[in-house]
Amino acid sequence: MSQLTHINAAGEAHMVDVSAKAETVREARAEAYVTMRQDTLAMIIDGKHPKGDVFATARIAGIQAAKSTWQLIPLCHPLLLSKVEVTLSVEPVHSRVRIETCCRLCGKTGVEMEALSAASVAALTIYDMCKAVQKDMVIGPVRLLAKSGGKSGDFHAGEVQ
């Protein structure tokens, strides 16, 4: 069974020492969903939201979140990200927005938390911009889709039912 890497022998939380690790290309993808009423979704699609371009704002918020992950999650390392991509798409059949993020770097630690932070904050931004119109939007699921690089190898999530 795998050990928790952020807990030392005394059971105390600590930041992992990555100084001896080799630099490798690492990439992670994550997704999040925001489900809403059809009229709320139409307002976003038609560009009629009073606060402006919801997708552009959510995209920038996601990028900022990835770059700020180390400030939000206590034991994350500050990373020199080489790529942050936030893609938003409409799923009208499910009355929701799908957010997919991709983070990449060449470094000593993975970018899973950065990808998840980007997806989460983009979803929260959509909620924030639309809450005056609809307060019962649902955020989720939020999950890691894939990661590559590093000692633990590759990971690919299964399909969500």
From Swiss-Prot:
A Gene Ontology molecular function term of the record: cyclic pyranopterin monophosphate synthase activity
SUPFAM superfamilies, sorted: Molybdenum cofactor biosynthesis protein C, MoaC
Sequence positions that bind substrate: L75, C76, H77, M113, E114
Keywords: Lyase, Molybdenum cofactor biosynthesis
Gene expressing this chain: moaC
Associated pathway: Cofactor biosynthesis; molybdopterin biosynthesis
Lineage: Bacteria, Pseudomonadati, Pseudomonadota, Gammaproteobacteria, Enterobacterales
Catalytic activities: (8S)-3',8-cyclo-7,8-dihydroguanosine 5'-triphosphate = cyclic pyranopterin phosphate + diphosphate
Protein name according to UniProt: Cyclic pyranopterin monophosphate synthase
InterPro entries: MoaC, MoaC_bact/euk, MoaC_sf, MoCo_biosynth_MoaA/MoaC, Mopterin_CF_biosynth-C_dom
Cited function: Catalyzes the conversion of (8S)-3',8-cyclo-7,8-dihydroguanosine 5'-triphosphate to cyclic pyranopterin monophosphate (cPMP).
